[in-house]
Amino acid sequence: EAYSLLNNPTGREAISTLIKQMEDNKSKFILILAGYENEMRELIQSNPGFLSRIKEYFYFQSYSVEELTQMFEEMAKEIGFTISPGAKNAFSDLVYSLKDGYHFGNARTVRNILEKSKDRHSLNFKKGIVKNRFELDERDICYEEIRI
């Protein structure tokens, strides 16, 4: 995320260098910055050089719960797992509750949920709670937020 450049002196120096390159090489220099909208706005406003030189902005909408659920199923399939209907519903409910949170990371969050759920599934399988070795069910779906 480009806005992480604001957090230290080296990053601020990099920002100054980028702005100089944008001015000195404007006909042959393309700068692409990416990150969350609010933090990017803070980055752009941190230096008048950005405000006067950046002319194009692209905004991407977050994925819908349905799209994230499909992504979850596809990621699980890639590692040899299927998703029971109950697990699919549990995942959708979980994502719905997390989706508007500040640190929700779309595909990154989906991957983290899958990894935690797979770990829980292994324990549930060992304990005999679930019977199918390669099918996640609703008891497997879990997510623990990182507390800062």
PLM regions with names:
Residues 42-45, 60-103, 122-129:
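Conserved C-terminal "switch" segment of AAA+ ATPases
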Residues 1-6, 19, 23:
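Catalytic acidic motif of RecA-like/P-loop NTPases
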Residues 14-29, 75:
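Substrate-engagement module of ASCE P-loop NTPases
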Residues 1-2, 33-39, 63:
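A short beta-strand-to-loop transition that corresponds to the Sensor-1 phosphate-sensing loop
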Residues 38-53:
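Short regulatory helix/loop adjacent to the ATP-binding pocket of P-loop NTPases
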Residues 37, 86-89, 107-108, 114, ...:
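Conserved C-terminal helix/linker of AAA+ ATPases
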Residues 25-29, 50-56, 79:
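Short glycine-/polar-rich loops that comprise or flank the Walker A/P-loop
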Residues 2-12, 57-59:
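Flexible beta-alpha connector loops of hexameric P-loop NTPases
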